[in-house]
Amino acid sequence: MPKFDRAELEQAFRTYWRTGAVGEDWDAWADLFTEDCRYFEHFYGRMRGREAVRAWIKPVMEKHGEIYTAYEWHVIDEDRGRVVFYMQNRRDHPSGQGTLDFPGVSILEYAGDGRWKSEEDYWAVKQREVAMREYEEACRRHDPDHPRKRTRWNWGDGPEWSRGGRSWAERPAVR
């Protein structure tokens, strides 16, 4: 017998995605975790508790506000209450042509009632380093102010619920 209903897991994941990746409301996103959650971020380390996650995510996303997340796919494991998803950490190229991406995979474990009890994030470190370097060089060549513009020109080919507007200012209110 499944631990959680598939429809509940799907709805919780869509809310998680729309709140964080699309809406970029990091306070509301942190509230989707249990008070005692576990979070392992491959680069930044381990965190314990919702407030630790909030204290980490807000300054990171402010510092790297030009990055957005393009959905590729997700799978649901009803028996274990898990959602695994694959995405691209994306920056629009300052020339207006193309994107600079590095892929990531995350594993969410559901606690019920719309909350997550754990998350593990993994991404391609070498590809991240290349994308960061290429973006910095492209900004110097094409548009030094590009990071402040927070463009979101290419959300990819995911379903409608996984995409937002063309700039950070156009992000939808999710609450």
Residue locations for each model-derived region?
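A structural signal for well-ordered alpha-helical scaffolds and beta->alpha junctions
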Residues: 10-13, 50-53, 101
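Tryptophan-centered motif/residue detector
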Residues: 17, 21, 25-29, 44, ...
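A general structural-boundary detector
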Residues: 15-16, 40-43, 94-95
